[in-house]
Amino acid sequence: MLELLFLLLPVAAAYGWYMGRRSAQQNKQDEANRLSRDYVAGVNFLLSNQQDKAVDLFLDMLKEDTGTVEAHLTLGNLFRSRGEVDRAIRIHQTLMESASLTYEQRLLAIQQLGRDYMAAGLYDRAEDMFNQLTDETDFRIGALQQLLQIYQATSEWQKAIDVAERLVKLGKDKQRVEIAHFYCELALQHMASDDLDRAMTLLKKGAAADKNSARVSIMMGRVFMAKGEYAKAVESLQRVISQDRELVSETLEMLQTCYQQLGKTAEWAEFLQRAVEENTGADAELMLADIIEARDGSEAAQVYITRQLQRHPTMRVFHKLMDYHLNEAEEGRAKESLMVLRDMVGEKVRSKPRYRCQKCGFTAYTLYWHCPSCRAWSTIKPIRGLDGL
């Protein structure tokens, strides 16, 4: 109850100020006193958990005196913040339908009703509300941002692109990153139906929106591979190392396939060496170790792995080093113990999440471009360090 009382303090202050000003007018003193008593009665209903009676009383007061609009807007927002969305909708809907509101007040009511519908998951109704505000100077950016949330929630990617492009024109350049992702989402739909040409057209638009989009480059690489154009796939996938080196590990298996198809094993080793030098993660180190072992022998690979473990210690590289030691160990209890230890390390590596959102900390075993927790784009990266990649 005390929590609710504190939540009501802004409403009481606003209404008290208003009633004090109105009460100064002697000819309306009686009316002010009656409305003040009604307001206190409404608060009492709230404090006694009779919220519906309180809402009815406040709405009746609104019909008699539109000077309480701001107080009612605040009250509706309080209900929404407490999860009582139905009551918030009742209040804001009644406000919006009131014939005595000023133009500005009506826009405020529409805005808050749209947020109520968003909170209730009624996206079609919320969309209708915010569309009414997109041509209003003081409400335009906020309404477009709300619409952008709606279209992402409903996977209406072309609408999301249209809204985001309007925001870019209004100075919100950060939306370019999201626009590239929206084009990628559309491209995925066409890739699923084997319409690779249309998918590539969409990806090029994504690249135009954000030239640093690693996701666009990775998806272009996949499309080129599907079309058998391995040289172009290599060109696209290699761009990632300059766009976002933390995501290079997502390209390595595809690049390995492309270089094999092209018969360019030396160039593949050179790229891995570059990836290792730029500290892109354990995947590149382990792949290069395999090449060194095949070319120069197990001992050379072990020396290389030991050096990398000293520079950038990770459990995955340590697990690889244990494999080399096991291959050299003589049969006996020492080797058996080493095998147990290696298996324990391997299980730990497999059980650890591979990715983490840099914004909210959400962890996952697969890469998400759109964080399921905080809904941010491009914030999930491979985990680095001892337990990471």
UniProtKB/Swiss-Prot annotation:
Gene3D superfamilies on file: Tetratricopeptide repeat domain (1.25.40.10)
Binding locations of Fe cation: C357, C360, C371, C374
Source species, domain of life: Bacteria
Gene Ontology process terms (BP): lipopolysaccharide metabolic process; regulation of lipid biosynthetic process
Ranges: TPR repeats: 35-68, 69-102, 107-140, 142-174, 180-213, 214-247, 249-282
Membrane topology, from the record: Single-pass membrane protein
Subcellular localization, as worded in the UniProt entry: Cell inner membrane
Molecular function (Gene Ontology), one example: iron ion binding
Cytoplasmic side: 21-389
GO cellular component, one term: cytoplasmic side of plasma membrane
Disulfide bonds: none
Chain segments annotated as transmembrane: 1-20
Keywords: Cell inner membrane, Cell membrane, Iron, Membrane, Metal-binding, Repeat, TPR repeat, Transmembrane, Transmembrane helix
Its biological purpose: Modulates cellular lipopolysaccharide (LPS) levels by regulating LpxC, which is involved in lipid A biosynthesis. May act by modulating the proteolytic activity of FtsH towards LpxC. May also coordinate assembly of proteins involved in LPS synthesis at the plasma membrane.
Alphabetical list of NCBIfam families matching this protein: PRK11788.1-1, PRK11788.1-4, PRK11788.1-5
Family: Belongs to the LapB family.
The name this protein goes by in its record: Lipopolysaccharide assembly protein B
